[in-house]
A protein has these predicted regions:
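Sigma70-family region 2
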Residues: 2-4, 43-60, 79-81
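Arg/Lys-rich amphipathic alpha helix in sigma70-family domain 2
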Residues: 52, 67-88, 110
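DNA-recognition helix of helix-turn-helix
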Residues: 70, 74, 143, 147-173
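C-terminal flanking helix
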Residues: 18, 22, 43, 125, ...
Length: 174
């Protein structure tokens, strides 16, 4: 029996994965505007490579897309202007959309808790954040994370252990 692979369009890939790439970039860069810019750069690279990809590569492109996204975020963090900008703008401002089902007190407490978690998360090393997000937020296996980042599974486990230990220490074991 022959299995036909349904042709995949660039538009379909973009629609299916743009949100995921944007979320990953926001978590790694802690800045919505930078994340949007990097996500656009990532999909520009995807568009440039799309014509050269065969159907098998297109069907298994998600790990490649994540790897390209992580590398683009790393490049942004390494750039001199970004370091200057981040130093001058320490507070990460997340848009807070009102939720009418919660009281103002609950909303304030929720924002405070989110702020505490975010500040603790930002204190992780860049590699710890990458590994933590890919493993626990995006739910990739340890082996997949290792392959995407070009490190061993032992290194992934070590980064996860250190990240969890750091977060427990900062946030308390609640």
């Amino acid at each position: 029996m022959t299995h036909r692979i349904k042709p995949v369009s660039y538009e379909a890939l973009y629609a299916a994965h743009h949100g995921e790439v944007l979320r990953l970039c926001r978590l790694l860069l802690a800045n919505h505007h930078d994340a949007e810019e990097i996500a656009q750069e990532v999909f520009l690279k995807v568009y440039q490579q799309f014509q050269n990809m065969n159907q098998t590569e297109l069907m298994m492109w998600r790990p490649w897309l994540i790897r390209v996204s992580v590398n683009a975020c790393r490049d942004r963090r390494r750039s001199g202007w970004w370091k200057l900008w981040r130093g001058a703008n320490e507070e990460y401002q997340e848009a807070n959309y009102p939720n009418s089902s919660r009281t103002p007190e609950e909303m304030v407490l929720s924002r405070e808790a989110q702020g505490r978690i975010w500040r603790a998360f930002e204190k992780l090393s860049a590699r710890q954040r990458e590994v933590f997000v890919l493993r626990h937020v995006d739910e990739w296996s340890t082996e997949e994370v290792a392959e995407m980042l070009g490190i061993t599974t032992g290194s992934v486990k070590r980064y996860l252990f250190r990240a969890a230990r750091h977060l427990r220490r900062i946030l308390g074991d609640r």
